[in-house]
C-alpha cells in the first residue's frame, strides 16, 4: 500500500491516475492503492484503487462496514452474491453512461472486476483495516 502525501491538498488528476495505473500494471496483483489515510488504523479509509483486467479480487464482505466505489476512469463490473454464491446483482459502472458508483451495504458478498485497462476507482470505507478471515472469502463457481 502507498500512503498519501500528507499535503494540505492533493489534486487527483491524470498524472496521479497514470502513475498509479503504471504501478498496477507492473504489480503481480494487477492493482495498486494510493491511500489518503495515513495508517490502517484510521477510522475512515479513502483511497484510489487502480485495477487492471485480470486482477484477482476475491468475493468478500465486510460484516460491520459499508463500502463505496466511484469510478474515475474506465469500466468496472460489480457483482454481489447471496451466501450460497448465487448472483444478486451484476452491473457495469461506466461514467460515460452515467453509472458512476455504488454503495455496498454491510455484510454483502461482493467483488469488482476491471473491464478496461487503466481503470481507477475511488473507494471509501470505515476503518480500521481488518484482514479477511477464512469465512470472509466466498468461493464461487464461475
Feature roles, as predicted:
Residues 48-64:
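Conserved short histidine dyad/triad with adjacent acidic residue
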Residues 64-84:
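Glycine- and acidic-residue-biased ligand/ion/polar-headgroup-sensing regions
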Residues 2, 12, 20, 86-92, ...:
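Double-stranded beta-helix
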Residues 82-107:
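Short acidic-glycine-tyrosine-enriched beta hairpin
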Residues 59-60, 78-80, 101-104, 110-115, ...:
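Short beta-strand His + acidic residue motifs that chelate non-heme Fe in jelly-roll/DSBH
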Residues 61-63, 70-71, 114-117:
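Short glycine/proline-enriched turns and hinge-like loops at secondary-structure junctions
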Amino acid at each position: 500500500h502507498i500512503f498519501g502525501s500528507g499535503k494540505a491538498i492533493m489534486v487527483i488528476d491524470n498524472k496521479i491516475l497514470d502513475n498509479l495505473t503504471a504501478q498496477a500494471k507492473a504489480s503481480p496483483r494487477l492493482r495498486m492503492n494510493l491511500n489518503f489515510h495515513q495508517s490502517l488504523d484510521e477510522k475512515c479509509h479513502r483511497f484510489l484503487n487502480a485495477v487492471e483486467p485480470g486482477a484477482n479480487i476475491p468475493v468478500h464482505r465486510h460484516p460491520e462496514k459499508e463500502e463505496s466505489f466511484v469510478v474515475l476512469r474506465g469500466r468496472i463490473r460489480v457483482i454481489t452474491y447471496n451466501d450460497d454464491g448465487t448472483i444478486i446483482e451484476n452491473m457495469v459502472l461506466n461514467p460515460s453512461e452515467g453509472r458512476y458508483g455504488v454503495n455496498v451495504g454491510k455484510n454483502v458478498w461482493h467483488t469488482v472486476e476491471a473491464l478496461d485497462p487503466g481503470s481507477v476507482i475511488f473507494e471509501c470505507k470505515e476503518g480500521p483495516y481488518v484482514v479477511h478471515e477464512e469465512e470472509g472469502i466466498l468461493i464461487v463457481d464461475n
